[in-house]
Amino acid sequence: MKDCIKIVFASAFVCAIMPGCQDFPDESKKDESSFVRLEEVAEILAMIPIDCNHMYEVHHAVSSSSGNGYDEEYTMRNLFISPGSGVGDSPTRGQTDYPEPLRDLIEDYVYSTKSAAQMDPDEFISALAESDIQIYWPFSENWDGETMPVVTFDPEDGSDVNTGYRLKVDDDGFRHVEEVVVDEEMAAQVPVWVVNRNSDAGYATIEMLRREDPDWGTGGGNIIVRPREAVRTRSEGSCKTLVLRDFQMNRNFDTWFAGASEFFVKIGYLEDFTAMTEAEMRLYDPMVTDFMIVVKRNQVGISQNLNAVLMTGWHEGEDKTENRCAFMITEDDGGTRTEWSTKAKVFVEGKSYGFEISIPLSSRDDIVWRGSLDYDWFDRLDGSPASFGDVQLTFEVMEL
């Protein structure tokens, strides 16, 4: 079984392993020559006659996304289909709340300007609405309710500074745009809309999972674990559960234009392993628990409480140091689908059993840490934080 969870807020014993990677086609891979460019969308937003009602629309959407556990973002998909709704909201929310939503201004502008160019307006609008492009509004909670935004875009080259367009309306109602230099310091002082690409809308946050299934718990000190069918148990030995209590990011992994950092915490193991023969061993499939954790930029250096189950059905054997799991932390940067092929092992009744584990990742991901961990290490560490590269994790071993 594979549990894939997205959590938003928002070292160890290392065994050298030579990873093997196999490429897979990725249908969601972004075409580098995308029909709709980030810079183009930023220019459109700077040219259309935005007023306070449109500001409130975007602010409501990014606030809703943040409340649903995502970053402060307003996707083009939501902007065109359900104005004012955030990531995680119902598709029908907000459709009648805005008599002249932002999408109408964008459509009017595109039809009036691109009809004269060698580009079909309908095709452009369709491509924009179906793209991964979004408006990211950092520090949106500081908006005073009236200041117009500076519009910029992610240069996607690692830069921390870019050109932006400041929207101003004079006392006589005359509207004009001035070109400015935008950095994160400016974004903390005045409203800045960053046109960038979404990378988290395809996953459910812990907040969304709690709403959909009360059995997941209510947060705080509760353990978040999906209800499961009864599992095989042994009469001898204790059965333990590994819980990831806290996660702390010690530096931002992406430029501020890209928004939050998305981490995948992956652990591969054999659950409730009781095989006594090679034939029985073939009946077991490795489990891969895969958490996506999104940490906002203002949460760097701050411990985030998760209380998420990583590994269940863990029985102590005669030699706990012989029981190993495969563990990896990556920071998502996209690319083609690959996998980390490695080995882990369990020790039962005096015998050591090795098994293959394939853990998925993307080709451009930053590998924060990967390796093999023995179960005894978790027992010895229990409750104390451990460093894994530039992140810090706190585990707890629970006996159930």
List each model region and its residues.
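Bacterial Sec-dependent N-terminal signal peptides
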Residues: D3-C4, S11, C15-I48, C52
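Long, charge-dense tracts
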Residues: S34-S238
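Short amphipathic, basic-aromatic surface patches that mediate peripheral association
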Residues: R234-A258
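Short beta-strand/loop motifs in extracellular/secreted proteins, especially
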Residues: S261-F263
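Eukaryotic beta-sheet cores, primarily in C2 and C2-like/PH beta-sandwich modules
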Residues: V265, Q299-E349
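Tryptophan-paired
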Residues: T274-E318
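C2-type phospholipid-binding modules
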Residues: D332-L400
